[in-house]
């Protein structure tokens, strides 16, 4: 006869791939929704058009960061390229510049940062947490899936860091991170 600990360990190992698949499915669903939402989008916020769109297109056309003396407004050069580098990565993958790709890339960053609350042991609770976070972001920052601004991204990334720190069970890892 097998002892209970051995059987429990086997059962736990059997559940791990299923939890990963469920989490991945949620991620995939959010990515598909994001893709559909961003189809045929145009810039909706002044910052998106004035900075993020211009810097993204510059990166795609010139294949390098702007330098002093380039045709861009000098005020743009004073600001870090930030997420436009990730937008550029997606332009490069798709082989073209598109506003739709900009928003889609931004949403992948957002969804990835939100995914810190996913608990592979409790998918229903994870979906509730994701929903609450999206609602809170929308209440505080407006429609976060239709903006290229980084304010809400910085907030959710900071939240993600605190969430990881707070939920870490190994005290030594807490001290290292």
Show where each model-derived region lies.
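Alpha-helix initiation/capping motif
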Residues: 20-25, 80, 98, 124, ...
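Membrane-embedded helix bundles of polyisoprenyl
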Residues: 30, 104-121, 125-165, 175-177
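A ubiquitous, low-specificity "background" feature that marks scattered single residues
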Residues: 9, 53-54, 157
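Membrane-interface junctions at the ends of membrane-embedded or membrane-associated helices
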Residues: 2-16, 120-124, 164-176
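Short hydrophobic/aromatic segments of transmembrane alpha-helices and their interfaces
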Residues: 32-34, 40, 47-49, 136-138, ...
